[in-house]
Amino acid sequence: MLKRQGFTSKRLIVLSAVFMLIGYNLTAQSDSASYWKKHFDVNGYVKFMQTFSGDMEGEIYDQSLWHNRFNLKFNSQTKNGGTEFYLESRNRIFYGEAVQINSFMKDTLSKDVGFLDLSFSAGDERSFLFGGTFDRLWYKGYYKSWEWSLGRQRINWGINSYWNANDLFNAFTFTDFDYEERPGSDALRIQKTFKNGANLEVASSIGADSSTVGAAKLGWNIWNYDFQIIAGKYYGDYVIGGGWAGGIKDWGFKGETTYFIDLEDSNKSAVSLSVSGEYILKGNKFLGLGALYTSNGLSGSADVSASLLAFQASPKSLMPTRWSAMATYGGEFGGLSSYALVFVYLPGTKFGLLMPSITRSVAQNFDLSFHMINVGGSMNNEPVFLANGFVRAKWSF
């Protein structure tokens, strides 16, 4: 059996610092600036986010977060192919009341679900917590119609706008708006593109406990629609599914479904199905509608207010409830500002989420934004409500 490979916290810190210094030096050397500009790309951002959380009893908790991302890319091209290497780190510092009352936060930050242990934490809940991870560390090569990659990467098989039942390797929770890059997995991927535009992709990933996911995806275009079918194994389940993306008149129309087959216990087999439609309105405004069916989700009355915010999605369980419906509306104003309003309703549980946001470009590479995640509903004829507000400043480099 393969054993998980780990790094000590000190080695990770040193490795992160070394690569940051290399990236800085490469871009700073004037005598070979053209070479480094051609083959290397360094970028990232620094964010500060203040969070306030409140409940029906009037209790309010705060949390402050400093968030840094550093991305380093190397590329070398030949006549018919090329090579690319990516190293990306995510570093966060938390402090505040919400950190002090969460005794599991430090363990959560240091937990790495990949085969390589590339995450670590430091600090104390009574003062501050630091969490660092390399969520991208991978190599990509390509030659003519072939492409291959190895390492911690994002394999995106999702085609639906909101819920991705086909995304076997990197399912994400849509309420985690502060993680735009989304998680990666330790995987090997090989892709072949055919002359008619069709493509075949095979991928396999391994987790911290040596559990594996392996599948193949075939994609093609016909009738102005993109279609795909997938088949493989998702941990202990065999899977088969597919998806589409096209349009009906002026509406975009997307969907995907996956059937998870448990050969040992048929009661644990599950179906995940999602559809969505998008429409562009006048004045650069956007309207979106989506629905999700999860056969193993909750269908009766239940208090899901807390679990919605901490829910860890998987393609087999994208939401904790059996049925979910979503409506989104967004647009721009003043040329430098944008807004969005997202509403999610969970039939049966009598709960819903309301997530408004507004973003303002203050200067080049500097944005300010305000977000809210409000969860409300009824349990035993009693109202339940949780409010979370986020103020965020982001500087990109």
Where are these regions (language model features)?
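Transmembrane beta-strand segments of Gram-negative outer membrane beta-barrel proteins
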Residues: 32-55, 83-87, 198-200, 339
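Residues that define the transmembrane beta-barrel architecture of outer-membrane proteins
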Residues: 38, 62-70, 130-135, 142, ...
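Transmembrane beta-strands of outer-membrane beta-barrel pores
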Residues: 48-54, 78-80, 89-95, 143, ...
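Residues on the lipid-exposed face of transmembrane beta-strands in outer-membrane beta-barrel proteins
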Residues: 70-76, 136-141, 188-192, 216-220, ...
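Outer membrane beta-barrel
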Residues: 79-198
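Repeated loop/turn-to-beta-strand initiation elements of outer-membrane beta-barrel proteins
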Residues: 81-85, 145-148, 197-200, 224-229, ...
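Detector for outer-membrane/organellar transmembrane beta-barrel domains
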Residues: 247-344
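Outer-membrane beta-barrel "beta-signal"
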Residues: 360, 367, 371-374, 384-397
